[in-house]
């Protein structure tokens, strides 16, 4: 299947990790992300508190610039794309050069799936020939950055002038907002 193809291709291209680990990330992390948010409201009125005259409204941010590492190219682009598209945002993925072919393969699969669901393919785009200049330009032009990678890359995202969320080596960004079940979130974190 597709997951097996991507797992093997990732290991072959990057020479990082192993097939079983990559396959499990695809199966577990990407599906878990989708299942965690599939029923959540992500645009429009997401909550009403009539007793306080409060209506919470979520809206798209625009174009998300996603910086992805060579160490997890099989799952990171998918997870970022799920989150972006769920919020009716477009996403442009800037892969590490060592994982550019894996990224292209995954983006092509995602674009096909998006079209099959009746949405425009260009909601998900990738930089097929990545370079530092192109990534820097993406960070200047996009509306929000989601950066996953080494300290220098995440630091560049934070100092780009564009609002950014970054995940460095061994860390994970977890946003717990006021719509979260705090007991459940604490247990999972």
What are these language model-derived features?
Residues 58, 72, 144-153, 164, ...:
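Buried, small/hydrophobic-residue-enriched core segments of structured protein domains
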Residues 77, 106-108, 127-132, 180-189:
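Active-site glycine-rich loop that binds ribose-phosphate moieties when present
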Residues 1-54:
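N-terminal Rossmann-like NAD(P)+-binding subdomain of aldehyde/semialdehyde dehydrogenases
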Residues 79, 86-87, 154-189:
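ALDH superfamily catalytic-core signature
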Residues 93, 125-128, 146-149, 164-167:
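General beta-strand structural signal in soluble alpha/beta enzymes
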Residues 38-112, 117, 160-162, 171:
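Conserved small-residue-rich beta-alpha loop and adjacent elements
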Residues 43-56, 124-142:
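A structured beta-alpha segment of the ubiquitous adenosine-cofactor-binding alpha/beta core
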């Amino acid at each position: 299947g597709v997951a097996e193809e991507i797992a093997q291709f990732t290991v072959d291209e990057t020479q990082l990790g192993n097939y079983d680990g990559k396959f499990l990330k695809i199966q577990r992390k990407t599906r878990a992300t989708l299942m965690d948010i599939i029923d959540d409201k992500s645009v429009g009125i997401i909550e009403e508190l009539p007793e306080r005259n409060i209506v919470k409204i979520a809206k798209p941010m625009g174009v998300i610039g996603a910086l992805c590492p060579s160490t997890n190219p099989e799952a990171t682009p998918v997870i970022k794309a799920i989150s972006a598209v769920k919020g009716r945002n477009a996403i442009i993925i800037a892969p590490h050069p060592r994982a550019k072919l894996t990224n292209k393969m995954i983006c092509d699969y995602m674009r096909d799936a998006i079209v099959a669901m009746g949405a425009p393919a260009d909601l998900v785009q990738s930089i097929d020939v990545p370079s530092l200049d192109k990534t820097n330009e993406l960070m200047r032009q996009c509306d929000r950055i989601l950066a996953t990678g080494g300290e220098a890359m995440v630091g560049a995202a934070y100092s780009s002038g564009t609002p950014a969320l970054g995940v460095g080596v061994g860390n994970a960004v977890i946003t717990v907002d006021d719509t979260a079940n705090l007991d459940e979130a604490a247990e999972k974190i």
